């Protein structure tokens, strides 16, 4: 706890600076970050996702991506001292009327598909929009670094939303449903599942991609209506999330239909603004070929 207070205090001294000043810092450290932080992974991901693009085009995407990544870092730190008025001015939402209409019709649970696109941490401020007619929550996977994990739990929860550990998702959602309160739950669903959790593959960015199906799977069980969040960046320091209806009753459509549709929408967004997606992770390290080999060999443990 003492170490966390020191860590948070250090970040607070950065956070008190206005965002325009923090963006100067962002531009400065970006010069170094783009030369040493997971550059091989980023370049390989871009090469295989966009084989039709020239090397110069991919280099341009890489450059813009690292600027976005560094901006995200300082924007997230800024959350420590950003006022309610400022976050509501900088992070706006469209389609909230569609959510309220369905809540008014009696559906208490709403699942919002999100991605590692733009600044996904600021989306937690959506809870301010629900002060009179609902609440929000977000599914999260604990980070390996305890200090960072505690920080982001605090940052996400400061707007009044509920933090739900990934492994407790279904149980907690059943508890929330019993409360009888309107809930919007955000699912960031573009991460790579573990071997034991792979059940479905989709064509995504020129790869046969293992995907997470948990959001749709749970929505079918609890009759949560589902939407897709389309993130845009009108200008530096400002984001907008359009909430697009997908399906009011997920169990009424064939299984994995909404998962497939989510990745179709996300791929279109990435192709439109590739620099806004998170390219630093080995998204395609678990291939379908290797998965089939493991299935045939009866390998169940994680690596």
Language model regions located:
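A broad structural signal for alpha-helix termini and local helix breaks/kinks
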Residues: 17, 50-53, 131, 222, ...
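Membrane-anchoring hydrophobic helices of lipid-metabolizing enzymes
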Residues: 1-114, 119-120, 149-154, 160
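Non-catalytic C-terminal accessory region of glycerolipid acyltransferases
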Residues: 59-63, 101-104, 154, 167-303
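Catalytic core of membrane glycerolipid acyltransferases/transacylases, capturing the structured
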Residues: 107-167, 194-203
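Short, charged helix-to-loop "capping" segments that act as catalytic/coupling loops
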Residues: 34-36, 94-100, 104-109, 126-135, ...
